[in-house]
Amino acid sequence: MTQGIPAVFLDRDGTINIDHGYVHEIDDFQFIDGVIEAMIELKKMGYALVLVTNQSGIARGIFDEEQFLQLTEWMDWSLADRGVDLDGIYYCPHHPDATEEQYKKSCDCRKPQPGMLLDAQRELSIDMTASFMIGDKLEDMQAATLAKIGTKVLVRTGKPVNTEAEQAANLIINSLADLPKAIKGIKK
């Protein structure tokens, strides 16, 4: 039986794009410098790229699910136009303190819960121990731990890095742009 493919699980806001807070408009979406080139390199290295993003702005009524899906489609096409094909896109619109009742719940998909990562594992046949989770928050690291992802990578491009997040990570880098080089260093 094959183990599956290795993946890089990617948080969105603060990891792929600049986190302006509840980004939901195309005009507000800015890729962080170097991330597209890094994703191209990661694909060449044999990694599936899987987006896993909490989107509590939906639950809070800041934007609706349709707006999120439109932005996500634009982002996906923008990446594809530059040679990056995402293998999976998973999002959680829920929040326990939601103002929008249909999204008000404690769920297993909202990070730090591992639901999105485990769904991707099942649907894409991912080898979790050979995979990486990259994000800017403690919740990203906690979800990766619960999903038994091999390497947890914290980036400094998003929320301010705190001690607890640093301790939960296996590796801390400045940006997703640095991940291919970091992986090559680990694999030596």
From Swiss-Prot:
Keywords: Carbohydrate metabolism, Cytoplasm, Hydrolase, Lipopolysaccharide biosynthesis, Metal-binding, Zinc. Zn(2+) binds at residues 92, 94, 107, 109. InterPro entries: HAD-like_sf (IPR036412), HAD-SF_hydro_IIIA (IPR006549), HAD_sf (IPR023214), Heptose_bisP_phosphatase (IPR004446), Histidinol-phos (IPR006543). One of its GO terms (biological process) is lipopolysaccharide core region biosynthetic process. It catalyses: D-glycero-beta-D-manno-heptose 1,7-bisphosphate + H2O = D-glycero-beta-D-manno-heptose 1-phosphate + phosphate. Pathway: Nucleotide-sugar biosynthesis; ADP-L-glycero-beta-D-manno-heptose biosynthesis; ADP-L-glycero-beta-D-manno-heptose from D-glycero-beta-D-manno-heptose 7-phosphate: step 2/4; Bacterial outer membrane biogenesis; LPS core biosynthesis. It holds the Pfam family Hydrolase_like. Belongs to the GmhB family. This is D-glycero-beta-D-manno-heptose-1,7-bisphosphate 7-phosphatase. The lineage of its organism: Bacteria, Pseudomonadati, Pseudomonadota, Gammaproteobacteria, Enterobacterales.
